[in-house]
């Protein structure tokens, strides 16, 4: 044993070293340890402890001094222990060397085959892709129901349909090739497009659920089903108004100049149906209210720009095509009766819209997702929006009641309901509650609107049963005669291959009819009357060809009576 080993220093048996802390010395069983200890006690000297100095020798690296009577068993260091540096041996009082550890970087873990998505605060959301596809599917079902309600209406042409189809005696384009069926199919396409645009506008203003409820209620209205099966420009005018409304909602966060996209649609609507002119001020107000939350004072610039461009386009249209006729015709209808009829045709939807407006004013959001970020519209803006949408439904009834003219009021009511229905959809959504807590309320409202709409449409959609009359006239008309009838447009349309529209004249009653009969200038006279007029009773110039009664006895239509010149 060297001096350094006796002083507690380090031994250097070779390049390999060992630590006592990790590799304790080898010991014999308990019996040998007791024997060695007994020998140490027997001498009574410090030699026993001197023998224990061999234990200190075991602290050398790569070398072990066994106890007396013990076999030598060397211990080898591992590969990781060979990184320790040579210790400092400056003297007997030198401190033990602190080894420097080599930190090994862990191997990178393999990429997982599947990563769980981030867990949202709630397991429910209204703005994910799945809800969007569900909304589209439900909208398609709503449009199919609307198409079915319109297709169930059938019959010969109305007088206004025939006038629209003849177009001053000349058919053109798609109508010329497809006739009445093609024109009605085109009207249905416009009506379905208006419902789809209404859903889009309501979804942008409120949410998808309110949009679906609004589209569902609008699709079963009597005016919607009627215009979808009525060959006229009313459905086109509704489509243009719905497109303008959707564009106003779509561009509410854009620059004020983006509102110019909606101006052409709004300006064209009155030239398709004059009643659409009543709703241009509503569109102007909505141009401001829809953008005020995002643009502030810039929303008024947007409204002024929309009003100016729309007015300029309307003025140009009047200069080119003239003023639409029929918008200010006075009548003798009872104003009270017109208001009652309007309440029957649109009262249910208007009531639900008022409920939705009140709920919207009281609370901006329903609270299904209280953690949703974003500022809510103010109470004043909510009040103005609800008042504008609900009040618009009253424009056509009040205006025509003031005129005393109930012509096509059952159709014009639908123009105002186009603007009130978004608030009605919001009302249905609020009444069902958060997360569809009370779905039976929405189902009940929809079924009630459906039943009422079907009954009213069947009552109002009663075209003249003119098939038998047209069949009888085919045998007596030609391109040279003159004909007097109560329905000149219908006769001119169905007999357009045999006659010209100018050959058909509108029949009057009283002295005018008596004078025409006495003059004998008409080759045939066709009247819808329950009894024979006095002027034709016993007349020697005309003979009665036939009396054609309608197939629908409950329709209230008078039979056709045909006289031909002798």
Where are these regions (language model features)?
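Membrane-interface transmembrane helices that cradle and orient dolichyl/undecaprenyl
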Residues: 208, 244-261
């Amino acid at each position: 044993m060297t001096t350094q080993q006796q002083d507690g220093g380090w031994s250097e048996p070779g390049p390999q070293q060992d630590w006592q802390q990790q590799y304790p010395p080898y010991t014999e069983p308990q019996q040998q340890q007791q024997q060695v200890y007994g020998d140490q006690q027997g001498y009574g000297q410090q030699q026993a402890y001197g023998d224990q100095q061999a234990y200190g020798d075991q602290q050398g690296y790569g070398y072990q001094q066994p106890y007396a009577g013990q076999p030598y068993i060397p211990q080898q260091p591992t590969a990781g222990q060979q990184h320790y540096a040579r210790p400092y041996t400056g003297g007997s009082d030198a401190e033990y060397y602190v080894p420097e550890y080599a930190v090994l970087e862990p191997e990178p873990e393999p990429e997982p085959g599947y990563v769980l998505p981030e867990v949202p605060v709630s397991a429910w959301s209204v703005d994910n892709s799945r809800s969007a596809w569900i909304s589209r599917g439900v909208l398609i079902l709503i449009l199919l129901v609307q198409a079915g309600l319109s297709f169930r209406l059938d019959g010969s042409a109305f007088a206004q349909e025939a006038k629209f189809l003849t177009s001053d005696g000349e058919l053109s384009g798609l109508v010329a090739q497809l006739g009445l069926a093609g024109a009605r199919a085109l009207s249905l396409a416009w009506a379905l497009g208006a419902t789809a645009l209404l859903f889009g506008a309501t979804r942008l203003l409120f949410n998808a659920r309110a949009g679906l409820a609004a589209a569902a209620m609008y699709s079963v209205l009597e005016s919607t089903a009627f215009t979808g099966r009525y060959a006229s420009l009313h459905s086109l005018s509704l489509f243009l108004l719905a497109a303008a409304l959707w564009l106003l909602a779509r561009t509410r966060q854009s620059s004020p100049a983006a509102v110019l996209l909606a101006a052409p649609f709004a300006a064209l609507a009155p030239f398709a149906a004059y009643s659409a002119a009543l709703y241009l001020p509503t569109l102007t107000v909505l141009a401001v209210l829809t953008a005020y939350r995002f643009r502030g004072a810039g929303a008024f610039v947007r409204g002024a720009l929309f009003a100016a461009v729309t007015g300029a386009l309307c003025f140009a249209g009047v200069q080119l095509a003239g003023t639409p006729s029929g918008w200010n015709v006075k009548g003798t209808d009872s104003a009270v009766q017109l208001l009652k009829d309007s309440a029957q045709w649109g009262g249910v939807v208007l009531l639900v819209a008022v409920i939705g407006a009140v709920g919207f004013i009281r609370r901006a959001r329903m609270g299904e997702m209280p953690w949703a970020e974003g500022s809510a519209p103010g109470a004043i803006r909510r009040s103005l929006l609800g008042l504008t949408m609900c009040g618009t439904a009253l424009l056509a009834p009040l205006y025509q009641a003031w005129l005393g003219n109930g012509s096509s009021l059952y159709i014009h009511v639908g123009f105002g309901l186009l603007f009130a229905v978004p608030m009605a959809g919001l009302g249905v959504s609020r009444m069902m509650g958060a997360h569809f807590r009370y779905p039976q309320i929405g189902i009940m409202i929809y079924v009630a609107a459906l039943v009422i709409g079907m009954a009213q449409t069947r009552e109002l959609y009663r075209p003249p049963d003119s098939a038998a009359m047209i069949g009888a006239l085919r045998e007596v008309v030609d391109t040279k005669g003159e004909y007097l009838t109560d329905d000149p447009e219908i006769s001119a349309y169905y007999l357009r291959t045999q006659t010209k529209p100018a050959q058909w004249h509108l029949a009057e009653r009283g002295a005018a009819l008596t004078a025409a009969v006495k003059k004998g200038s008409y080759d045939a006279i066709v009247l819808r009357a329950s009894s024979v007029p006095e002027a034709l009773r016993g007349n020697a110039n005309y003979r009665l060809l036939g009396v054609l009664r309608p197939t629908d006895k409950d329709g209230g239509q008078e039979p056709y009576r045909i006289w031909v010149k002798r």
